[in-house]
């Protein structure tokens, strides 16, 4: 019996149990009372609408389930950012569905709500996927309006994207199933087709109370902007539905008539499960992020038939590169090796660290994948680039810059999985969020930060100690230990996968066994968008 394997397995399964528990809580939205209120109005919830709309026999993945987690407690919270975003299939067509959750502050927009909607549109644009908006929102959450209204990546960007997607020929369908007010009223009208549900859907720039205050006119909301008004008088909407299900049925019929998209042509054959048991990942992945392990053991439990054709196997060993398949799709894998390795020259290299040779290898491999039009999968467990005089004299900065250049300029779809550490410039070199991965997800074990908690706490402690000394105060060993523990606790909270997911630094926190489905759905989505730009590394320092 392998005691370490069993210890790891128990720890990881317990962490995943916590993940499922937190997901269940998030999916309750604004709570049972608000859900009952919706039902009493004859309306379905956001999640019920999506469940009814999507094909039951096809997979689906949810984007940003933890968005807003712990960010707005003073305002009563904002589960899932008050909007549910799912990539799934409607009438056999892969698409993005965005549904306002009216159980959360009547679907009002928090700052993170805008960010999540923009992420949904970004996914649709990058992959040329149809996008369906299920609208039921009271508009901007006024107490936080200064954080959502005027800036480039705020609320207004959504309508800019509406216009841009329309010009790109990306199908947009909007269904108004509740309130659609103020600036939000433009969204359905800027879509290709707009449906509205009779008696529950309404669209207006200003509601009846504001109209009364502004111009003295007395009018009720239904007459002002209900389904009959907009389908028979203003011509703003195209179809009137009797209820939520009737509207969603019409969307399904519309989606069924869409032409098939032109494909990028990424290679796919019949899918096969890994020969090695994927469940063993739980025992391989260490409890502590500082412990070494062989990343190849993880890869062989993720790829079809457990076949990984390694590129430059004996060179630059702290990064693994090679070709494989996931659910039949060809992929090029770039992964951090976490065990200590020994070079042919006898040099010992730390796992999870990027050295000059591994940076060179990864750069060349990324170029090869662009040449062959093979999507890239980055498996992150990186603590950064190697430091010290030997590395500096050897040109680690220019070698790292080449890798960052290759990642930034890559034109094939990129996908990132944060398995463990994702620290500092290593995050950039391994295709962090700033480098436009089509999807970026974290396992429960992922940590995203400038550096590890212990190291950061030591640096911050030194700064705090120096500040106290300037004031003439001295730290006793006991106070120093207490201050260190306090700083580390704060920092550890900020590097947790939940902190990152709440801010949409990642699209989701997933069970390792869900990785294959996420990558496969991501590549299938990317296959709808032919590559239009040539791969060009630009100027590099050799």
Where are these regions (language model features)?
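Ligand-binding clefts of soluble mixed alpha/beta catalytic domains
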Residues: 1-542
